[in-house]
Each structure stands twice: as structure tokens, then as C-alpha cells.
Amino acid sequence: MKAVIIGAGEVGYHIAKALSPKNDVVIIDKDEEAAKRADELDVLVIEGNGANAEILSRVLQNADLLVAVTGVDEVNIVACMTAKLIMKNKNGWKDTKTIARVSNPDYIDSPVTSRAQVGVDLMICPELALASEVADILSSPSAIDAEMFAEGKVRMTEFAISPESKLVGKHMQDLKLADCCIVSAVFREDQIIIPHGDDLIKANDHMVVVGKPESMEDLESVFGSKVSHRTRILLIGCGIVGMYLAKLIDKEENADLRIIEHSKSRCIEVAEILENALVLNGDGTDVSLLREENIEDMDVVVAVTDSDEKNLLCSLLAKQLGAKKVIARADRSDYLPLFEMVGIDMAVSPREATVNEVLKLTMGRGIQTLTTIEGERAEIIEYTASEKSRIVGKPLNKVKFPKGALINMVVRGKETIIPRGDFIVNEGDRVVIFSMASAASEVEKYFK
């Protein structure tokens, strides 16, 4: 496959990094430093304006995908429109799929949408996708990550095991999980473990659990402490991410939301839109304000300002003052491990949402949903099995599935099944798989 990426910032760089090992990748950026960094990858780098028709004409022939992910919405949209016009006027050229990263809510009102009428096959808003991800996590206060698959029939939730947890020292088989619910993987420092019943649970393990949403309702009592009151949430920053997240939380009956926003005019605007939230004009680093709002009683503090450094400081203060759980936005990929190293419960990145959507388009026809976890070290992938899929029609114990991958769930009609060795996958089944990043390309071969 040939992919053209416009923009070599955080998002563009990581898309190129993910695609370059097995694809022809061209990356365009007018910033000299960004282009120089991209040149470290096995890609063709062009220094210039990615919306320029002359440059696009040179690289679009035989391209399967064009991804415009600069920091300017209009440049991304114009690049996609220009690409479509060029292809329309070139006889015999394939119709390249176009993707644009867009942040302005005037252009987009959902995380992913199509604007084919203006030449954009897929429009992705990383900020809205991030807000949706955080809202899913907030539905389970003890979780550090969450995702839905198979149109809501399967849920993935990731939990961190604290040193004080009653689970430390127990065997996997001692976990009292509901039916149709399994531990898919354990992340332990640099290790990724597909667990067995006699494996011990250790402090600071990150455990990925997959199951029916209704079967996972009691996981709070297994992995954390079940909250008996309305979930108390403090949101710091109400920009694009914060506003969209606040709207999602505001609809929940079981949530008590407070917002700290430094801009007075923005506070007035937010207060007029939200029905149930308390909006405070102030600074998330103001210790007196945090104490006045009884931050030690907060179940979750979410810092989503536009500054990574401010989010880090707000999060550290919240932790120090007794907040039970802290989630922070980190746009820079090199900051993600730093946030968790200093004790922040979870660092979330708008970049990952865009990378996930692009990878889903490039990895094969059968993919329905794909999400990366633990800093792109592993993936949860949902495939739809076709008549030609190698996995169809034989017992799973006869299928030599790649090492480092595990079939977690199969959705067949209204049924959600944990497959055993004698289970046979049928055409049309939706198969949810945990895979280490190194095994993902091998997994794909079973569904072609």
C-alpha cells in the first residue's frame, strides 16, 4: 500500500512510524525540523506545502491513502479536496481515500464522520475522540482505560493493581469474575503476559479484562472499591476536549460534575450550555481553590487544558491533595511515560485516536474496530470473519494462531461467547482479539 501523509507533527509522525515497516509512505511538511525528524523513518520526506497541487500531483499516483494531519484544519481539508480534484482529472489513477484531522467543532460534531461531498472521505477529530474515551473510562471509576466493541456487545476495561490491593499475591484463577468475562492480558513493567490460571497477580500490574458490558458491572468490587454515591468529578480546563467531555458527563444521572476554567467569558458560555454542572472561574493550580472544593473527596480529577505542562502540574497537585484518581491529557508522546512515572493514574493522548482510525483503514477489509493500549505496545482488534477467512470452519485448537495473540470474544447474532478450543468460527462472526503489536500483521492473515 502507498500512503501520503501531510504533516509530520506528533500525529503524522506516529502514523508514518506505524505504516512504514510494510508500506510505501510519503510524508510532506513545510517545517524543516519536523521533516528532519520524519527522515529518521524509512519514508520519503518532502519539505513543502502539503496542500500544494504541484507537490500532490507528484506523489498521488498509485496512492491508496492520503492523510492530512497538520495543525490547521483548513489546510487539511483543502489538501483532501485538492487531491480529489487531481485524481478526477487523471485518467486511470485510482481513487485515493482521503482522511483529514479537524479540531474546530464548527466543522465536526462527532469523533469520526464523513464529508465526502467536499472531498474528505473520513474526518477525524482527535479531541472529540479523546473526550469519548475519557467518558467511557469515567463510567468505571477504578479503570484506567475502556473501549467498546461489536456495537456495544463487548467491553474492554483496563485496571491498575495498587500495592494495597487485596488481589496482590493471588492467582488468576482466584479472581471471581462473572460469566462471559476474562482477563485478556497483563502488563508488568516491560512484559506483556497472556495469563494462565496459576499466574500470580503482582502490585502495579495492569490487567486488561474483556467481557459482556452487563457481566462487567461488578468489576469495581473486584479491582477497586465500588462507589456507593454519585461519582464526584472535577474537570480542569474547558476547551474543545473539556467542553465535549463535560456535555457527555452532564447527561449522566450518577455524576456530580464541577469544572474549573480560567477564562471568565468561557465560564459564562459553559454555564449556559450545561444544566447540571457547577462552573468555577479559577486556575487548576490554585491550591486554595482546590481545597475549597474538597478535592480530597473527588473520585476523579481530569486535567484537559491545552498545555501538557499545566495538566501535569494540576494532576500532581490533585494527587498530593488526596484525589482518588487523576487522568491527564498529554499531547506530546514523550510525556506519556513521564506522567505515569510520577504517579498520575492515566495519561491520555488525542494522537492515539487518530492513529487508531488510520490503522483500521490500512490493516484490511475485515477490521471493524481497532484500539491501541499501553502506548501502542498492544492492540485490541475486532474482525468480521468472511467466507474466505482462514480461521473459518475449523476448531480453534486446530488453528495455529500467532504467538502473542488471543481470541477473547466472538459475537454471533445476539450471542456473546468466550470461545474454547473446540469452538468453530463461522462466516459473519465478529471476533475480538488481543494482540501484541508484533503479532498484529500475522493475525490479519487469518481474516483475509
From Swiss-Prot:
Superkingdom classification of source: Archaea
UniProt: NAD(+) 1 binding residues: 7-11, 29, 70-71, 101
Domain notes: The RCK N-terminal domain binds NAD and possibly other effectors. This is expected to cause a conformation change that regulates potassium transport.
A GO CC term attached to the entry: plasma membrane
Pfam families: TrkA_C, TrkA_N
Transmembrane segments: none
Binding site for NAD(+) 2: 232-262
A molecular function GO annotation: potassium ion transmembrane transporter activity
Keywords, sorted A to Z: Ion transport, NAD, Potassium, Potassium transport, Repeat, Transport
InterPro entries linked: K_uptake_TrkA, NAD(P)-bd_dom_sf, RCK_C, RCK_C_sf, RCK_N, Trk_Ktr_HKT_K-transport
Protein name as annotated: Trk system potassium uptake protein TrkA homolog 1
Gene: trkA1
Domain RCK C-terminal stretches: 144-225, 368-448
Protein's job: Part of a potassium transport system.
SUPFAM superfamilies, A to Z: NAD(P)-binding Rossmann-fold domains, TrkA C-terminal domain-like
Domain (RCK N-terminal): residue spans on this chain: 1-124, 230-348
